[in-house]
Structure formats: structure tokens, C-alpha cells
Amino acid sequence: MITTLITHILNPLAFIVPVLLAVAFLTLLERKVLGYMQLRKGPNIVGPYGLLQPIADGVKLFIKEPVRPSTSSPILFILTPMLALTLAMTLWAPLPLPYPVLDLNLAILLFVALSSLAVYSILGSGWASNSKYALVGALRAVAQTISYEVSLGLILLSLIIFTGGFTLQTFNTAQESIWLIIPAWPLAAMWYISTLAETNRAPFDLTEGESELVSGFNVEYAGGPFALFFLAEYANILFMNTLSASLFLGASHIPMLPELTTMNLMTKAAVLSLVFLWVRASYPRFRYDQLMHLIWKNFLPLTLALVIWHLALPITFAGLPPQM
């Protein structure tokens, strides 16, 4: 009984609660960073230095009345935000921080599978809202997500060939002597840009283009369900950056200080998340055709070429005599 309680309730909660707390303070950090970059102060009224602002926002959203459009599809309308958050939380289970909750042999395949399932929550919410703006936003988001998943998958394939394993622990071991960002820097650059597009962040925030689509696929959502979408989006941003740190920035390995493993990984993920915010403050939104041109005409041929290159490398060097 106790073991069941620990494995099925306490273990998941042990990573879900910190992730949700991190998401809350990431929203505050984003508002502060954008504020200072636009030469103004961010939130600074609620609590010391505005530290209680995200908690106030969360409470406000969840005590609002959940308004539902009369013409919407009732069950799907409520189910999709729940699906979005569930998927965003499940993604964290196989991440070694330093030990995964789910120790899988094919962890990277699970990431790809679960991140492509997120498409259904977006499409479902756009369709269930029964609003043309929500549907246009959802279709854009789905096209963008599916397109950039192609390059993410191919980059992951190259890295798997490079390191020789599907688990992030293998990546950890492979990067003990050199971080993968150095030999595979073109992959790292394309991966980072693709994660920006995959998480619908500026300059790829076409789905919530305020100028033409009000707020994108979640335009009809208010209160609690909207907060669930919001939490899912920011949890995905944090997850993608933690994954990027694991794949390219030597994961969490310091041979001299194994105690600092988790702090090390979190610091790298936080720095990458700050760059996400910096990009948002600096760049204007892409046009839709430029967004699609970038992936299909630029990234796809390049990633395919690099997959072939990484396939050829081990075969080429296999014939060399061992170095004494």
C-alpha cells in the first residue's frame, strides 16, 4: 500500500509541484525582463519586489467564472486544456534530474511522441470553441508544430547516432569530455530555433498574433481553463530548455562535484530560458510564409545532410588504426 502510494502519487507530485512553481516564477521573470528591456519596471506592487504577483494571478484566474460560449462543444472544450497540461507534465517524467521518475530505454522517442500529441489539444481547443479566429489560430499552430517537429526529430536522430544511445543518461556519459554544442554547433543552433517555434514563442508566435487573431486558439477561454493552457505553454518552454541543456550543454555532469548535478542542469536551463525572453524582447514576429520557408527550405535540407554526415563519420573512422 505504502509503496503504491509513493510510486503513483508522491513521485509524480515531487516533480509536478516544483515544475508548476518554476512556471509561476518564470512568468514573473518574463514580465520583469521585458520591463527592464523596455526601460520600465515590471510588476512591483504585490509582495516584495512583486514576488507574489504570479500567485495573485493564479488565484485570480481560478476564482473567475469559467465562461463557455453557448455554441461550443461542451466536453471537448473542457477536456483540451486538461490534456495540454497533462501532456506538459508527463514530458518531465523521463528527464534525469539527476534520476528520472520513469527510467526508460527509449526516453527520447517518448519526448517526440508526447510533444506531437500536444497538437491534439491545440486543434481540439480551436475546433471546440466554434469561433473562426480560434480555428485559424489552431490550424496555424498545428501546421507550425508539425513542421518544426520534422527538424527536431532529424536533429535528435543525428545526436542519437553521434552519442550511440536513446537515453539521456547516455548523452550524459557521451559529454564527459566535450559538450556536444562544440562538435555539433549547427545542430544546436537549428535545435534552439526549432524549440522556439515548437513552443510558439516570439518571433514565431504566429498562433497568438494579437494584431490579427486576438489571442489564437485559446481566444474563447477564460479563468481556470485559460490558466491551464498558460501553465502548459510555460512548462513546455522550461522542459525544452532543460532538454536542450541535457542534449548539448553536457547535461548535468561535473565529475569533481556530483552533488551539484541538479543545480548545474537547472542553471543551464535557466540561462537558456533567459535567452528565450531576450529573443522575445528583441525580434519582431515572422510572416507566416517566412516561418514555413525557414523550416522546409532551409532547416530540412541542412538537417538531412547532417544526418548523412553523422552516419558517415563513424563508418569513416572505423577503418583507422587505434591511436596510441
UniProtKB/Swiss-Prot annotation:
Membrane topology annotation: Multi-pass membrane protein
Catalyzed reactions: a ubiquinone + NADH + 5 H(+)(in) = a ubiquinol + NAD(+) + 4 H(+)(out)
Transmembrane feature ranges: 9-29, 43-63, 75-95, 106-126, 146-166, 177-197, 228-250, 259-279, 299-319
Annotated GO CC locations: mitochondrial inner membrane
Keyword Metal-binding among UniProt keywords: no
UniProt keyword terms in alphabetical order: Electron transport, Membrane, Mitochondrion, Mitochondrion inner membrane, NAD, Respiratory chain, Translocase, Transmembrane, Transmembrane helix, Transport, Ubiquinone
Cellular location(s): Mitochondrion inner membrane
Coiled-coil annotated spans: none
Disulfide bonds: none
Assigned EC number: 7.1.1.2
Pfam families assigned: NADHdh (PF00146)
GO molecular function: NADH dehydrogenase (ubiquinone) activity
PANTHER family listed in its UniProt record: NADH DEHYDROGENASE SUBUNIT 1, NADH-UBIQUINONE OXIDOREDUCTASE CHAIN 1
Family classification: Belongs to the complex I subunit 1 family.
Functional summary from the UniProt entry: Core subunit of the mitochondrial membrane respiratory chain NADH dehydrogenase (Complex I) that is believed to belong to the minimal assembly required for catalysis. Complex I functions in the transfer of electrons from NADH to the respiratory chain. The immediate electron acceptor for the enzyme is believed to be ubiquinone.
HAMAP family given in the database record: NDH1_NuoH
Name of this chain's protein: NADH-ubiquinone oxidoreductase chain 1
Lineage of origin: Eukaryota, Metazoa, Chordata, Craniata, Vertebrata
